[in-house]
Amino acid sequence: MQNDAIKSGQDDVNSHIQMPKEVIKRFHNQYKLCCYYDVKGNFVGTKGTAESLNTAWGFFSARTEHYLGEKIETPFGKVLAYIDSLDFSQNSVSVNLNCEETVRDFMYSLIARDPVFMQEMGTDGNILSFLPEQMQHDYVAINGFSAIRRNGFLSDYLLTFQINETEIPFVLPIRGLYSYLYKGSIAINLPISKSIALCLIHKNLVDVTNKNGAVIMLSISDPDTVMDLNSWAFRMQKKRGWGYVVCPERHELDRLKKQFDSKE
């Protein structure tokens, strides 16, 4: 049952609020650290770790942590291992439907775990507002995910990969997802390393993303394109008013901070 992940009481567990540590770890540098932009503090730090960023004690119960790990994060970890085995020197790869479904489930979970989304679900007058805060988080993380999945969100999108061939690294917003216009339609990115992003393209652009059943990879060789994508990622996280933007290298975060500071 959906509510099996929810129990009463407060667990003293250090939870990753939204983005799991296994994804953040992929943005570590050679020192096993990551640079990060702190949205609330408006500063760039250089000694972040996957274990410490985006965490809070007691945010989820231990049972919900186990549920998310087993149902969402472990399957997605297997997809990441599969992606790491792909030959990106080719311009297309075969991706099975289970892989695509797992990626969507992970994206749905990221949306449901967004603290802003959770806060909106638990506003005054909603029955959730009468529950302890941890139970609210548990409920929305599980049932919000199920509702998003049931409604077929993103079902009109096809999975492809963006391969960053430039020296400018992709940045990871802790929210995970960001959207932008691609050939007149909305596209959605989820960076999984400084050089690879999962990309959902609307099915009306199927000729761009698929050829004879194989997924066409979208290679980026123009640094300006990567910087534009990073700007969308940075902007999306800042709009949430909380969280971090992560990168193995500081210079790109400094550039983005300067860009957005000049607009405020």
PLM region descriptions:
Residues M1-E264:
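Alpha-helical structural context detector biased toward long hydrophobic helices
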